[in-house]
Amino acid sequence: MRKFCLGVILASFAVLLAAGISSAQQRFRIGYAVPLTGTFGRDGNLVKDAYTFWADLVNAKGGVEVKGKKYPVDLSFIDDKSMAAENAKLTEKLITEDKVDLVLGGFGSDSVFAGSAVAEKYKYPMISGSASSNKLFERGFKYYFSTLGKATEEVRGCVDIAQILSPKPKTGVIVGSDILFTSLAAEGYKKHAAQNGIEILLFELFPITLQDYNSMLIKVKQKNPDILFVGSHLMVAMKTIKAMKEIDFTPKMVAFSYGPTVPDFVKSLGKDAEYVVAASEWAPNLPYRDPFFGTAKQFNENYFKKYGRYPDYVEAASAAGAYAMQVAIEKLGITPPVKEPDRVKLMEELHRQDLATFYGVVKFGPDGANETHPPVAVQIQNGKLVNVFPKGAAEASPWYPMKPWKER
């Protein structure tokens, strides 16, 4: 009798264990490494919020719908501490030890460059909404995708805006930090400045660890440019504005490749953020929509309801990337646990994808870059980001020229 009871107990335990395993397998386990601390900690937390926003909405709707059945999403993330080598190591851990079904990209071209190489090695599709260095797309990779355009094109709106400014700017200075994205953004400024007839008086890259911004900008001030173009992340953009005020330097316009669209920029600088122009690839007034997030405006408002702040374009791009992966999974009928043949099919489907989203059309080229996403320029006016270029998408005219610091 004891043996019979023990057998029943063990059998019941085995059934429960199997049910638990089965239940775990009925969820998409998705992981990513992202900077939550260090130089890019604030930026990385935006990406984390974007993925969480997407996953929470998926789960609120019951899960990813495949062949009439819904599968919830489990997100796991690890802090790469703003170090590219750490991102590669953690991405490998997610794949080989944690055995996640899928991966997403972290933040920044350097870290994503490293992490995507690991994803390529293990044939894991990786979509990023926060890395756009041209070099990411020059490796012949099949498994890396970006909802952003290339860095050199991302800043085009910040230069092309000169076409509608009066008096038309004739000269510029380009500075930027010497890391992957920002140095290529600086090269993009140079390319588009030449096309717009803007003479570049100085081109200089500086260490990302630079502390003395005043001395660098005094050199820039001496050139007396109409426009200062900066290859930047959030930290660089904030330090540049603070130093410009300290040395009383006011060109007619200042433009940044990234930073001012992050809510912390205006929050930290207050009125000193006024007049600043920044590159962007999305704005909530644009006429984009999809059946999952709704319109660009609805995405913007719902994001505010969840986080108490509006998203920047990197958050929109990151959420759109996760959605693009979701749509491909649903179309292919992939169910968890995801196996290598499924991931190969997923990669192939992403290369075919031509998807209308709240963020705009997502259509990946052979190199993984988003081919159809036009860059825009935004400006901080009365504490808010306003789309000012191109004209067809603008909410307001650009404030130009900048008011001198002493007149504000």
PLM region spans:
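Extracytosolic ligand-binding ectodomains
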Residues: 2-16, 20-408
